[in-house]
Amino acid sequence: MKRVLLCVLLTAAACLAQSSTSSTVIIQNVTVIDATGAPAKPHQTVIVSEGKIEAIDSSGGGFGGKLSGTQVDGTGKFLIPGLWDMHVHMVFGDWFPHGKEITLPLFVANGITGVRDMGGELEVLQQWRKEIAAGTLIGPRIVMSGPMLDGPKPRFPSSIAVKTPEDGRRAVDDLKRRGADFIKLQSLIPRDALFAIA
């Protein structure tokens, strides 16, 4: 039951933060786990303003006066830093047809606030990233490679074939121009092309 309540708390906070980035959310009496190895800190008040944690204090006593904003009761619940899934493929041909409608909100509901897409359709992912930033789509922060680079006979249809050093440099330049955050390489790239890419 506590897991369900935590998911509801995280989803509610994410929805509130995305629906109006100028709003303030105050989570009171929550147990904070900061993931540094320090013991859990019970009875904390966390203030989130414009999508960022502004302050954490025990019982809100250090804030002085009445706190204004959307109040969330964290009694019996835990608050942790957002998690990252460092290897996902959200748009990969027709393998994951419901990524936008199902997968993105499920990431957030399960505490995943950031993902690294390791090979997918760059333009689709960029559109999702814009919608998430605008608050019209619930989902995690996305960093993406776009199509993977592979050797002369790629294993996946969406991969970019690299035969020569020139192919490699051209592919990297093109992905950079199109907005890729990083480049993912597969294992079939010829040695000379690999060094040109590096």
Regions found by a protein language model. Name each.
Residues 4-15:
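Bacterial N-terminal signal peptides
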Residues 103-123, 140-147, 176-188, 198:
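Divalent metal-dependent hydrolysis catalytic cores, especially in the metallo-beta-lactamase
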Residues 77-136, 152-156, 160-166, 192:
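Metal-associated gating/positioning segment near the N- to mid-region
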Residues 151-198:
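Active-site gating/metal-coordination segments in enzymes
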Residues 30, 46, 51, 76, ...:
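Divalent metal-coordination and catalytic microenvironments
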Residues 63-64, 132-140:
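Short helix-capping segments at alpha-helix termini
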Residues 17-22:
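Boundary at the C-terminal end of the N-terminal hydrophobic targeting segment
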Residues 36-80:
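Histidine-rich, glycine-flanked metal-binding segment
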